A protein has these predicted regions:
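Conserved P-loop/Walker A NTP-binding site and adjacent catalytic elements of P-loop NTPases
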Residues: 40-144
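Helicase-associated low-complexity/disordered flanking segments
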Residues: 1-55
Length: 144
């Protein structure tokens, strides 16, 4: 996992969002997901990301890989982009995050042109903390 960022001087606006609900990974885990403790391997991956280090996590299906980027996403300023080829997984995760109070969206081929444009507009306004993007969107001319 790689955290990409811009210096505040590179943009006209600064990210001024703060997180008043939780200040630690443990608080975020409890409030967002209802768990009292992390599964094996999750905390070390999260700590690496929060410290600004690269992290590579290989975990079996159902081991909680998503938590490894979702927790840092809500604790750190800015937007987290998640590249995922699985449309149904994107939809499920965005629904769960939105229900937990985390502003999330997805951009993939299931969106109408109107919904796509609205999602892009809101993303540019800084509405979302997490955006799931299908890989083919990254190669669409003009997307980035």
């Amino acid at each position: 996992m790689k955290i990409l960022s811009k210096n505040a001087s590179d943009t006209e606006t600064k990210d001024t969002r703060t997180n008043d609900k939780y200040h630690t990974p443990e608080q975020a885990l409890k409030i967002l997901f209802g768990y009292d403790s992390f599964r094996a391997g999750q905390k070390s991956v999260i700590d690496s990301i929060l410290a600004g280090r690269d992290a590579f996590a290989v975990m079996p299906t159902g081991a909680g890989k998503s938590v490894c980027y979702q927790i840092p996403a809500v604790l750190l300023p800015g937007i987290t982009l998640v590249i995922s080829p699985l449309i149904s997984l994107m939809q499920d995760q965005v629904k769960a995050l939105n229900e937990a109070g985390v502003q999330a969206a997805f951009i993939n081929s299931s969106l109408s042109e109107k919904d796509y444009n609205e999602t892009i507009r809101k993303a540019r306004q800084g509405t979302y903390k997490i955006i799931y993007i299908a890989p083919e969107r990254l190669v669409t001319e003009g997307f980035l």
